[in-house]
Amino acid sequence: MIKGIQITQAANDNLLNSFWLLDSEKNEARCLCAKGEFAEDQVVAVSELGQIEYRELPVNVAPTVKVEGGQHLNVNVLRRETLEDAVNNPDKYPQLTIRVSGYAVRFNSLTPEQQRDVITRTFTESL
């Protein structure tokens, strides 16, 4: 179990008023904020803190979501007509940039087959 603390008394003056997360299962403390010898995010054994007194602080832990094979969304704010015109008149659109698989790419640098694929995948009649 993890609990948040603020150290109110300690033999080491650098610990006074510092904030920590204590992990009772691992017997470790993670520094959130302290003066002197402890760095932010430094993890130490609880015993390294020595004799301390503290007050508990509320801790909100956001649940983590692990998704494999999750969803991916590319947003292109264009009209179908613009892309089709770029296929037929590439000189009019030298700077036209689109998102493909998370990367920005110049539309004119794609092969004609890739350009058609982008248009087909981007503009559908229904889901």
From Swiss-Prot:
Molecular function in Gene Ontology: formate C-acetyltransferase activity
Positions carrying Glycine radical: 102
Family matches, as NCBIfam families: spare_glycyl
PANTHER family: FORMATE ACETYLTRANSFERASE (PTHR30191), FORMATE ACETYLTRANSFERASE 1 (PTHR30191:SF0)
UniProt domain Glycine radical: residue ranges: 5-127
A GO cellular component annotation in the UniProt record: cytosol
Function: Acts as a radical domain for damaged PFL and possibly other radical proteins.
Protein name: Autonomous glycyl radical cofactor
HAMAP family per record: GrcA (MF_00806)
Keywords associated with the record: Organic radical
Organism field: Haemophilus influenzae (strain PittGG)
